[in-house]
């Protein structure tokens, strides 16, 4: 049984009641590893002192591994944090050997590993542990966050050069005692935990439609992403839903959704699966157009929030209206990858080779942000290019998981800033010290800079455009967050 974390009265945290997970759903585990005296326990305690901890033991961990559950509903954080003993004991006795074995077992049970290094000293033991982690866990098998502790002062890339020479793809400088960059570390943990493929527990119903039909046992199904189709009323969402469901090889099951008025359908295309979120229709007929738009907006908001990827459906004959503009703004605000499907394209008369190009130009003039969003014309009723829409959705889902190493990001961003150098003020030159990726969807970077106010809107737009082109981020919101210090 794991040891509970002992707290002094001054640091006592009010216990928080954590929600129970669904049947078979495992709470992820994050373990801190490293040699002795690099500050693992200090980091463990510092993360818990942020008042995120529930005083609850992680079941199945031996008494030599400290653990506590970290839970914060507002930030969507829920995992077990484990502190392992130093893994560099030489010539261990029988007791030390059992401790080491327990620590290595803990690594196997972890979903994410924090490998902690000391900024002031790199030893042979560090290299030995690094080699072990590389051989044991590939980059796909188990994410590893490489943290350099005791970085109490501002760092630039030269201070991290020794660690990059070790072949580390990404280095996060932190201070466990000063709490520097601990918030960023939590964001990285969330980033790796949330980027895993989804799972859903479904209850398959037997073929009989009778009331006494018995449900089959719960089954776990994998899916690549959760898809929502949104658009203004009468844009053809129901027709597109029917068309999409008609293209799959098998509808595995309908699943109760995350909101009271939605149903999720697990669809299989070859060996690939997606979870399609369908919100129910408005139960009462709205007496006014304002009421219809209000209820449509609320349903749209729920669908977007519960999805990983969104198809924004437009009516080819009605163009891009104010309600569509609201949806696009909402997608940007929520950071959801999306693509545009222009429905009822078959109803456009006298089409020429220029028709689609002219339509896009009008669209971009109404909302310039759509310039970097994939657009496809379809007819849901005729099933025109619906298969292409499905293929584009899988492609966008794949691209929305793109992770870029810190070293590559730093190199490219500094090069792009040099290209745009003539637009800088000579008296207020912007300088980037360090940047790192904290999420994939949206593609969110945190940049540590000399002065936030030196980064003007034209430079920010230029950097976003370069990132979109370099990493194929069309349809994926790009967020650049600037910080003048590392606290």
Swiss-Prot record:
Keyword Methyltransferase attached: no
Organism from which the protein derives: Leptospira borgpetersenii serovar Hardjo-bovis (strain JB197)
Binding site for GTP 1: 34-41, 83-87, 149-152
Any one GO BP annotation for this protein: ribosome biogenesis
Protein known as: GTPase Der
Subunit: Associates with the 50S ribosomal subunit.
Signal sequence, start to end: none
Classification via PROSITE patterns: G_ENGA (PS51712)
Role: GTPase that plays an essential role in the late steps of ribosome biogenesis.
Region (Disordered): 1-20
GO molecular function: GTP binding; ribosome binding
PANTHER family membership: GTPASE DER
Keyword Electron transport listed: no
Similarity annotation: Belongs to the TRAFAC class TrmE-Era-EngA-EngB-Septin-like GTPase superfamily. EngA (Der) GTPase family.
Keywords for the protein's UniProt record, in alphabetical order: GTP-binding, Nucleotide-binding, Repeat, Ribosome biogenesis
Residues annotated as domain KH-like: 402-486
Residues involved in GTP 2 binding: 231-238, 278-282, 343-346
EngA-type G domain location: 28-197, 225-401
InterPro entries xref list: G_ENGA, GTP-bd, GTPase_Der, KH_dom-like, KH_dom-like_a/b, P-loop_NTPase, Small_GTP-bd
Superkingdom field: Bacteria
């Amino acid at each position: 049984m794991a040891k509970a974390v002992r707290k002094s009265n001054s640091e006592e945290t009010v216990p928080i009641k954590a929600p129970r997970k669904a049947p078979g759903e495992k709470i992820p585990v994050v373990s801190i590893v490293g040699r002795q005296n690099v500050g693992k326990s200090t980091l463990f305690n510092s993360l818990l002192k942020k008042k995120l901890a529930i005083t609850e033991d992680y079941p199945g961990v031996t008494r030599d591994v400290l653990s506590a559950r970290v839970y914060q509903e507002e930030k969507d954080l829920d995992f077990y944090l484990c502190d392992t003993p130093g893994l560099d004991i030489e010539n261990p006795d029988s007791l030390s050997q059992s401790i080491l074995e327990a620590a290595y077992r803990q690594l196997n049970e972890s979903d994410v590993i924090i490998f902690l290094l000391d900024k002031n000293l790199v030893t042979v033991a560090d290299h030995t542990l690094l080699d072990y982690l590389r051989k044991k866990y590939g980059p796909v098998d188990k994410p590893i966050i490489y943290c350099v502790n005791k970085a109490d002062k501002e760092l630039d890339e030269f201070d991290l050069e020794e660690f990059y020479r070790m072949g580390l793809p990404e280095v996060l400088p932190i201070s466990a005692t000063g709490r520097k960059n601990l918030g960023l570390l939590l964001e990285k943990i969330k980033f790796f935990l949330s980027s895993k493929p989804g799972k859903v527990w479904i209850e398959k119903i037997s073929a009989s439609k009778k009331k006494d039909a018995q449900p089959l046992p719960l089954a776990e199904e994998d899916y690549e992403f959760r898809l929502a189709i949104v658009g203004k009323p009468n844009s053809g969402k129901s027709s597109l839903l029917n068309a999409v469901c008609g293209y799959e090889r098998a509808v595995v099951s309908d699943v109760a959704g995350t909101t009271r008025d939605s149903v999720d359908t697990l669809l299989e295309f070859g060996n690939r699966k997606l979870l399609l979120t369908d919100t129910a229709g408005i139960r009462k007929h709205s007496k006014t157009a304002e009421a219809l738009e209000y209820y449509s907006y609320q349903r749209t908001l729920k669908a977007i929030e519960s999805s990983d990827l969104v198809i924004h459906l437009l009516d080819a004959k009605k163009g891009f209206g104010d309600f569509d503009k609201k949806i696009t703004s909402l997608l940007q605000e929520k950071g959801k990858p999306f693509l545009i499907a222009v429905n009822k394209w078959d109803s456009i008369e006298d089409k020429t080779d220029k028709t689609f190009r002219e339509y896009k130009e009008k669209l971009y003039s109404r909302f310039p942000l759509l310039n970097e969003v994939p657009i496809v014309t379809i007819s849901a009723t005729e099933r025109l290019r619906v298969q292409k829409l499905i293929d584009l959705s899988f492609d966008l889902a794949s691209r929305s998981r793109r992770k870029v190493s810190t070293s590559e990001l730093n190199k490219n961003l500094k090069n792009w800033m040099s290209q745009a150098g003539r637009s800088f003020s000579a008296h207020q030159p912007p300088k980037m010290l360090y940047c790192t990726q904290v999420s994939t969807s949206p593609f969110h970077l945190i940049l540590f800079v000399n002065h936030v106010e030196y980064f003007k809107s034209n430079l920010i737009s230029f950097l976003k455009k370069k990132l979109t082109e370099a990493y194929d981020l069309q349809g994926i919101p790009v967020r650049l967050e600037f910080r003048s210090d590392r606290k």
